[in-house]
């Protein structure tokens, strides 16, 4: 049934700042949630873990228990409508900057060895928190550029141990692959040239998450006597294909290689949480666990490439179907975030930048469009509703869909990451509450949906006219100047007005 128009207009007015892609120009967050002793922040990011993988989501479809993740979920807030971007690089760019990745020319994952990545001009969450007095460390997968000036220690992290991307493990040791294409686990501190630690091959892939966990545990232990709060970012290799478990977990689950890897991941998360407890830091540490994308099911390759499950949703990585863009996310902060809470309100990975700024007393940039919204009051239970009711979903440089409340309006179609985008002349709409597989088009009975999403698209387009999206792969050097000379060729929404008009005509 069509919602009350007064209610709709009121709600639209309330989200206007988010729709415009701009946060209020509040330079600091004094009087915020930041305590006299600022909280530590620990962010653990899993790779391609679908909605149906943790037992606390959908009952654990894979029959592999995740007791530590389940306990963690029960101790805080479990989000069931957490939204990410279409692939690894865009999701990580959104997390780091609080901006739609298309604004920086990032539309898809960066291929191993390819140029580009997050421009040094971007302000990352690590830089923002560092300026707010935090020590910053990252142990894990970056996937936001491997060139000079684009590694984690160039983008706000005091130290980094990890790897640029995961696909590169297939190259090492293979016949015909030149030595220059061998990649390594690397390590650096700010201002240093990264050092090669170990060849990143399939054997190392089995070991790497244990290595990251050990680094995180050691960092937390040493932080017991620290005089400054820390921001620790741990983006695991799990569960990016191929699923390769540590030898200690080989054959320990009923779920094959992937199940073994899942058991290991649950154990690693538990080890890091136990380190917080042992150091006496649990009560003053905000901990976030999330996944950057949905599953990557490729059973035609090898069993090790068949990873994860999207639960009740349809879709896989590289699409904007719910199975990819709706992933598990859990947040714990004892005494500040009520335990045992579950919410189906829309939250986006974009929202962590302004939310953490509010919590830590950091500054949000005011010289560029910001798309994330502050969710601190929602997370801490001071308000029931999220400050977001919609997300714009891009693929490459193209707006593919708009999700608003329980409705999803697809402007074009793509069912598989290796498929071809279908250019639809008429949008399709789905009621996610009744149709989680996004199969039953309801646009003919609900043409009014075009009027609802129109303002969101128009607001984004207006912001792009003022601050043109940057072309991808921009070189290092001077900060980009907003203007035609640096603008991307397309905004990603050129065809949308025509498609929305086709709805109005019916």
How does the language model describe each region?
Residues 2-423, 427, 432, 436-506:
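Formylglycine-dependent sulfatase
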